[in-house]
Amino acid sequence: MPKFDVSKADLERLVGKSFTVEEWEDLFLYAKCELDDVWEENGQIYFKADSKDTNRPDLWSAEGIARQIRWALGMAKGLPRYEVEKSDVVVYVDEKLKDIRPYGVYAIVEGLSLDDEALKQMINLQEKVALTFGRRRREVAIGIFDFDKVKPPIYYRAAEKTEKFVPLGFEEKMSLEEILEKHEKGKEYGHLIKDKPYYPLLVDSEGNVLSMPPIINSELTGRVTTETRNVFVDVTGWDLNKIMLALNVVVTALAERGGKIKSVKVVYGDFEIETPNLTPKEFEVEFEYIRRLAGIDLSDEEIKELLERMFYEVELENGKAKLKYPAFRDDIMHARDVLEDVLIAYGYNEIKPEEPKLAVQGRGDKFVEFEDTVRELMVGYGLQEVMTFNLTNREAQYTKMNLDFGEHPFEEYGHHPPARLVEIENPISPKWSALRAWLIPSLMEFLSQNTHEEYPQRIFEVGKTTLINENKETKTVSESKLAVAIAHPRVTFTEVKEILDSVMHHLGLEYELKEIEHNSFIPGRVGKIIVNGQEVGIIGEIHPKVLENWGIEMPVAAFEVFLRPLYREPYL
């Protein structure tokens, strides 16, 4: 979870009211933060804020916390309003960046008055959003520039690796290749673009370089100081919705410092957009649902008032509420998310505890304990555990695994339904558009993101997959699986099979392998795993085409098994 430092004096200046340290400890809860530490430095009191929500980047700075507290205390209510004036600035996006880093969104913020603390918060927010929300700049990278040194129009273009500019913190020009090899940020983030035919570059009309996304800004325009009054903000990445949200978070935070937001026209090959877009988002909820789940007797008017303290504009109609909420939030996906905001505004500490009406004695779930036993075995074999996302997409589960959609990744034990993914009807991003049916693609993605790390790489995951089962009420079934992948120059089928042998031995199970054909694996080096006459998994050496699809240059051997048919209570 993100942690960041804030000055008590700066927070109180933004809120417009002073509080004791003890009062601040309670106030931080409104911003889904905990006060992790307090210290004094040069006569000033500082707080270490520990955010407890990775879905609210708008709360990862002093500006966001102060804004939330003003609303929570009733000093303001309803939808925060930010005026966006249209500028005549245009950014042209090069179509060659389509497979490199395709999207950029931009804004101008004028009239800033930045002291040292405001500058620290701006840099902190930029870094935290890119690190956590942007997954270490892979999905979101942010640049902020002195706009007075920029000559529009601006071009986000594909550049030859031999082009040169002076990177931030240096005095001499370096080629783009040299920056990746010698600059601290190039070494840290260079793997994101190193293998691409071109590198992204943001330049103005005079050819002056603003930045090399997602690596480093230029010394000319990328050094923002307390003397800077007008800034140009750029956000690049792979998902237009995600980078738009990041832009909204940054510009509204700067607006809390008195900045005036101006939009920028962004021209792509086949469409154009105006950014930022601060149009409020909409959601509908029934207040009876809120009352029932909250367990608190609240009137419609009381719920409306609580929501207005959490940035909502509320329109009541026949027990339903039409809600509008700010464009710097993207965490409202279900009525439960609205309920959470109601309870935060109400105050969790104000909810009276009730004794359970049933006398029960708790204990750990036996199958979960079995999963932990399997994890301990894997760690004992020298494997490193990874935890990847349940959400994925059809390309990762099928195309990159050299499978046509509809082929079995491998069959579910006990019966053989059509190999269909559980897909999301309205995904927030194409990357997260389905629930995974098998784990090996997740491990392949992990390996593809760590090709710059030392080999051998020996990883495993015990995780959930979701399969379609028409006999279930929900038409789906969640299955726990174990997957192992080993990558190094001399890895073989035998090496990964030895781990499978040992797992089965420790669980007191006998198994057999039956050779099969499977496009994800090398022919003749793949088999299905059978226990008690049931197919429970697959094992083999990954096909070179799959390795190429994932950008992995090392051989990989892997296996995956369902855990439920391996579960035997005596082994806990």
From Swiss-Prot:
Location in the cell reads: Cytoplasm
On whether Kinase is a keyword of this UniProt record, the answer is no
CDD domains reported in the protein's UniProt record: PheRS_beta_core
List cofactor names only: Mg(2+)
Q: Where is each B5 domain found?
A: 278-353
Q: Which biological processes are named by the entry's GO terms? A: phenylalanyl-tRNA aminoacylation
- State the Pfam families in the record: B3_4 (PF03483), B5 (PF03484), tRNA_synthFbeta (PF17759)
List of residues binding Mg(2+): 331, 337, 340-341
Question: According to the UniProt entry, what is the EC number of this protein?
Answer: 6.1.1.20
Q: Identify the domain of life.
A: Archaea
Keywords attached to this Swiss-Prot or TrEMBL record, sorted alphabetically, are: Aminoacyl-tRNA synthetase, ATP-binding, Cytoplasm, Ligase, Magnesium, Metal-binding, Nucleotide-binding, Protein biosynthesis
**Reaction equations catalysed:** tRNA(Phe) + L-phenylalanine + ATP = L-phenylalanyl-tRNA(Phe) + AMP + diphosphate + H(+)
What main location does UniProt list? cytoplasm
Q: Name one GO molecular function term.
A: magnesium ion binding
GO annotations of cellular component type:
phenylalanine-tRNA ligase complex
Q: Which SMART domains match?
A: B3_4, B5
Family under the similarity heading? Belongs to the phenylalanyl-tRNA synthetase beta subunit family. Type 2 subfamily.
Spell out the subunit comment: Tetramer of two alpha and two beta subunits.
HAMAP family attached to this UniProt entry: Phe_tRNA_synth_beta2
What protein does this entry describe? Phenylalanine--tRNA ligase beta subunit
Recorded source organism is: Thermococcus onnurineus (strain NA1)
